[in-house]
């Protein structure tokens, strides 16, 4: 992990092997730009990166005056620098538009530091010839790129320290998620997932309860159990329950995650090319583990419960079948018409378990539907639920964190598509359209009336796993949901 060191000095006087200068909105006239003629000669127009070897400065373009583009550019700069021979880099402090008047300096520092730190991530556990980055340190000169009010300048050091703490916690939490999701299914079984959660619990002094199939049977979590039937003798399921309890808790929050450690589709078998990357189907459950790490280290004033349903969905003599009817923990019967719509079965029972805790808000995370990716694209997560204020808060705070999110609306016509003639509800829709929403409506069937306005469903199927670098996301798992939900919890508690 890149070490960031804060120094009360100017950018010019800071000592490092290389300088990093951002060209914001094509402004080449700043004093930190050392060789404008060189940039003009090579027709560098303030996008991407350009290395001035003579002055040992890497220029990184920020296309518009936007804090999110600053974060992205910082990440790109570090990805570039780690391929070079520089051990250290220096950078000043920038203040781009945050689209909000509150804490602009702090938000810029968070974006800068997080971008720098996330740029070094690479999952190379199984590579024989690992190429360790030479770049080890970033010196941040506490000098502002452009004049600021005196109050802003006076709070620079304080804001930098707070932002650095945030970036370190968020990077660690995201990397926990990335590593877990990237770990191949031969290793990352439900038991392994529980072991990762136990390590996080031990480090943060959290309560943890890891329940096996006997507990699931006692609690009548038959939908969850059905998904695991083909794996029961080899990789049994685990219900993982993490608890963070601060001394002062304003609210109780339940975070629920789908933890499918591998999903071949069950008897409704996926085509071979669709199975590749299905190790990422534990993205929701992994995000919940990362969130408990982040929220505990940030010391949020809420009692937070993380509930992960960890299982495989495989084929075998005991596999559950299309035409089966399952009785969920909530007592509702489910007609199975497709065993590849399994995540919603696991979540149905986990959401029931979460409601037994009487939380003030429930948020579930799942790589639930390909339809969500078709509808919103691979960069955006979907938000569903009944409470408009809660949905708006998650969307606004999530967008400010740098994640992309959009709301999808429930409606009565789509709800009819999951009706069953022989059970209370069917696990798939009778139509090929609106699949992300009908999956959310299926989950809604297991939300009790008193929790309807306290529940949000987040489908992270698009951005949870990245096959081509974009923004601050390296190849592989992105940790989708962690930044957004952390910001949501902080804003939710401000209103408590």
Curated annotation (Swiss-Prot):
Its EC number is 3.4.11.1, 3.4.11.10. Transmembrane segments: none annotated. The keyword Membrane does not apply. The active site is at residues 270, 344. Its main location: cytoplasm. One of its GO terms (cellular component) is cytoplasm. Binds 2 manganese ions per subunit. Pfam families: Peptidase_M17, Peptidase_M17_N. It is found in: Cytoplasm. Keywords: Aminopeptidase, Cytoplasm, Hydrolase, Manganese, Metal-binding, Protease. It catalyses: Release of an N-terminal amino acid, Xaa-|-Yaa-, in which Xaa is preferably Leu, but may be other amino acids including Pro although not Arg or Lys, and Yaa may be Pro. Amino acid amides and methyl esters are also readily hydrolyzed, but rates on arylamides are exceedingly low; Release of an N-terminal amino acid, preferentially leucine, but not glutamic or aspartic acids. It is an enzyme of class 3 (hydrolase). InterPro entries: Leucine_aapep/pepB, Macro_dom-like, Peptidase_M17_C, Peptidase_M17_leu_NH2_pept, Peptidase_M17_N. Mn(2+) 1 binds at residues 263, 340, 342. The keyword Transit peptide does not apply. Its cofactor is Mn(2+). CDD domains: Peptidase_M17 (cd00433). Mn(2+) 2 binds at residues 258, 263, 281, 342. One of its GO terms (biological process) is proteolysis. GO terms for molecular function: manganese ion binding; metalloaminopeptidase activity. It comes from the Bacteria. PANTHER family: CYTOSOL AMINOPEPTIDASE, LEUCINE AMINOPEPTIDASE-RELATED. NCBIfam families: PRK00913.3-1 (NF002079), PRK00913.3-3 (NF002081). Belongs to the peptidase M17 family. Presumably involved in the processing and regular turnover of intracellular proteins. Catalyzes the removal of unsubstituted N-terminal amino acids from various peptides. This is Probable cytosol aminopeptidase. The gene is pepA.
């Amino acid at each position: 992990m890149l070490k960031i060191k804060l120094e009360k000095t100017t950018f010019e006087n800071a000592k490092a092997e290389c300088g990093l200068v951002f060209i914001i909105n094509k402004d080449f006239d700043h004093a930190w730009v050392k060789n404008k003629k060189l940039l003009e000669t090579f027709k560098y127009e303030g996008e991407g990166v350009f290395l001035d070897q003579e002055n040992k400065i890497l220029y990184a373009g920020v296309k518009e005056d936007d804090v999110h583009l600053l974060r992205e550019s910082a990440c790109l700069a570090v990805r570039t620098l780690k391929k070079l021979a520089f051990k250290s880099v220096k950078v000043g402090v920038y203040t781009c538009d945050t689209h909000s008047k509150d804490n602009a300096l702090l938000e810029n520092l968070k974006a800068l530091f997080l971008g720098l730190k996330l740029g070094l991530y690479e999952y190379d556990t199984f590579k024989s010839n690992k190429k360790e980055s030479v770049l080890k340190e970033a010196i941040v000169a506490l000098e502002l790129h452009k004049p600021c009010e005196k109050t802003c300048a006076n709070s620079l050091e304080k804001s930098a320290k707070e932002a650095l703490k945030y970036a370190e916690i968020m990077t660690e939490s995201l990397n926990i998620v990335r590593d877990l999701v990237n770990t191949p299914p031969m290793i990352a079984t439900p038991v392994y997932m529980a072991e990762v959660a136990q390590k996080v619990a031990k480090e943060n002094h959290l309560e943890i309860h890891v329940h096996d199939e006997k507990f699931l049977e006692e609690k009548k979590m038959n939908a969850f159990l059905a998904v695991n039937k083909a794996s029961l003798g080899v990789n049994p399921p685990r219900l993982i329950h993490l608890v963070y309890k601060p001394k002062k808790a304003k609210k109780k929050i339940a975070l629920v995650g789908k933890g499918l450690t591998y999903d071949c589709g069950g008897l409704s078998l996926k085509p071979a090319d669709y199975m590749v990357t299905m190790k990422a189907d534990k993205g929701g459950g992994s995000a919940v583990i990362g969130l408990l790490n982040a929220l505990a280290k940030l010391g949020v004033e809420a009692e937070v419960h993380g509930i992960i349903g960890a299982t495989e969905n495989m084929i075998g003599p005991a596999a559950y079948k299309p035409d089966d009817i399952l009785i969920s923990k909530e007592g509702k019967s489910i007609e199975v018409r497709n065993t590849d719509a399994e995540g919603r079965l696991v979540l149905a029972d986990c959401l029931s378990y979460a409601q037994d805790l009487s939380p003030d808000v429930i948020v579930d995370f799942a790589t639930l539907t390909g339809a969500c990716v078709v509808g919103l694209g691979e960069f955006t997560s979907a938000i569903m639920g009944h409470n408009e204020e809660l949905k708006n808060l998650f969307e606004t705070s999530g967008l400010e964190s740098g994640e992309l999110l959009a709301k999808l609306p429930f409606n009565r016509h789509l709800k009819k598509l999951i009706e069953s003639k022989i059970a209370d509800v069917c696990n798939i829709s009778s139509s090929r359209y609106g699949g992300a929403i009908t999956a959310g409506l299926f989950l809604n069937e297991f939300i009790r009336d008193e929790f309807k306005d306290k529940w949000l469903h987040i489908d992270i199927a698009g951005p949870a796993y990245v096959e081509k670098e974009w923004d601050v996301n390296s190849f592989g798992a992105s940790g989708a949901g962690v930044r957004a939900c952390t910001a949501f919890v902080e804003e939710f508690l401000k209103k408590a």
